[in-house]
Regions:
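Short, surface-exposed terminal/edge motifs of secreted or surface/virion proteins that either
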Residues: 56-57, 85-93
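Periodic small-residue-enriched repeat registers in elongated scaffold domains
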Residues: 1-77
Length: 93
């Protein structure tokens, strides 16, 4: 359990971390919160990047919004699970 900076942050989950931010809490194991405010991880291996988020599932990264840059325009050679742009429609290889 590690709290690295910020204000009013807490980490009670084993192998969990809160890095910066305000009023963030990790409850379950192997979870992390990176900055933001008013976040809670309540599932094992859950991760939060953003603000005002409570985890909803284990083994999941939770965010408010994602921004993609330089998305491949073909699935050729991509690993399974990779996002690619198919004429303006996002696909998963």
């Amino acid at each position: 359990m590690l709290v690295g900076g910020g204000v009013n942050n807490a980490s009670s989950g084993i192998y969990s971390i809160v890095s910066g931010g305000y009023n963030n809490t990790t409850i379950n194991g192997c979870s992390a919160i990176l900055g933001g405010q008013c976040n809670t991880t309540q599932h094992d291996c859950s991760f939060i990047v953003g603000s005002g988020i409570c985890s909803t599932a284990a083994n999941t990264t939770h965010v408010n919004c994602l921004h993609f840059s330089n998305i491949p325009t073909s699935s050729a050679g991509l690993a399974p699970g990779t996002v690619w742009n198919n004429g303006g429609v996002l696909n998963i290889a």
